[in-house]
């Protein structure tokens, strides 16, 4: 990373940016400047000046006369995180299930939590797992046999894969596997996963598109803390073969330790090398922040068609009439589904009940001011299968006037706070301290040592050094050199002959 880029990130963080979003915006601009040859230098300059990428400007027809009617990418990055530390309540599936325990009937049942500790995969039973299933691979296989189908997803991800068993034959997303192969793939995971209920789309949704990856997205805001409201709703319909396999089995995952606000030392690519979309932050926040919204074609590349159709839904009566799809960089209006030919017209019968429930949930967790909820509409009701504390910047269905007004209010308040001199000094001190600890950790510590842990070690070691615990200074120096606190030596009988044990 160049010195100039580091300075720009520091400047943005002093002015209230979260580090991951500052890096995302700078990376998006850098990638766009380097690879996007479809726009002139003046078009790019205008877009960047107003906080957009030129592709987004063209897509929505943004110009000098209407630019104030839109929330820019830059500003949307700036207001992150709207929900502050409480965002963790709904960004992690297991935490969400525990927080929303009174609403469990509207959430998928969760059976097992799977995560790697050292070299082993830990299998932990969750709230909804029946007592007869053991915390083991045998318990998982028995559950799949009994249920027929279950879903497997990252706790911090957006995609699902289906594990099934029919007539004794196991499968992963329709691919036949043996029980040994299924367990082997689970043992190879690098992410934190949750095994949960398979939620089947109702026939009304399957009449539009027959796969099981269609959902209703609700964007919710709670402007004053006591008036949660759904500001926007649309159906997201599949148009191709859905697959969450790579996200679940092949992508890396980590468990956060400490505050990401203080120490955001995760290494990320500055410019994406192989695809047409900007890499998103893969941390415990903003996990689906962009969701492939920013499509940046390379030279001579064919127009890209998004795999989904978006159908705006009326909040008054749940009706919908017509959808939209992104072809290349053009938003195309649709009356029919492009694959099935089904008319994109109908009504969600239980919309009023759903909106009332969302309002109740919003009042139950008033700390969550802004979120999105993905709802699978079933034959007998609905299930809320995913929550996000910072909904994706819209790809096709832009924020409506109500949501834009709310987000612009958040932008104005954020900029007012960031402009105060005392806040600038506070942010500078905080970010400088973070920068120092990151560099010290990389220089002095073994690979993959987390800066927050090294900071804790340094402070604890300092306290131990000046404590009057009867341990000689020479012995303390030996303890610190070998990674121990001095009082532990006598407690565990540690000396030169056994410290490696």
Predicted regions and their residues:
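Extended, charge-rich helix/loop segments that form flexible
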Residues: 36-40, 44, 50-65, 254, ...
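Short, surface-exposed charged micro-motifs
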Residues: 162, 217-219, 372-374
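Alpha-helical membrane-targeting segments
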Residues: 1-45, 58, 63-64, 69, ...
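Phosphate-binding site of ATP-dependent enzymes
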Residues: 145-152, 156-157, 175-327
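Active-site rim elements
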Residues: 83-87, 203-207, 342-348
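Glycine- and small hydrophobic-enriched segments that form the cores of compact globular domains
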Residues: 108-164, 170-172, 187-195
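Conserved N-proximal alpha/beta basic substrate-recognition cap immediately N-terminal to
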Residues: 6-141
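C-terminal active-site "lid" helix and adjoining low-complexity regulatory extension at the edge
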Residues: 330-359, 363-368, 377-501
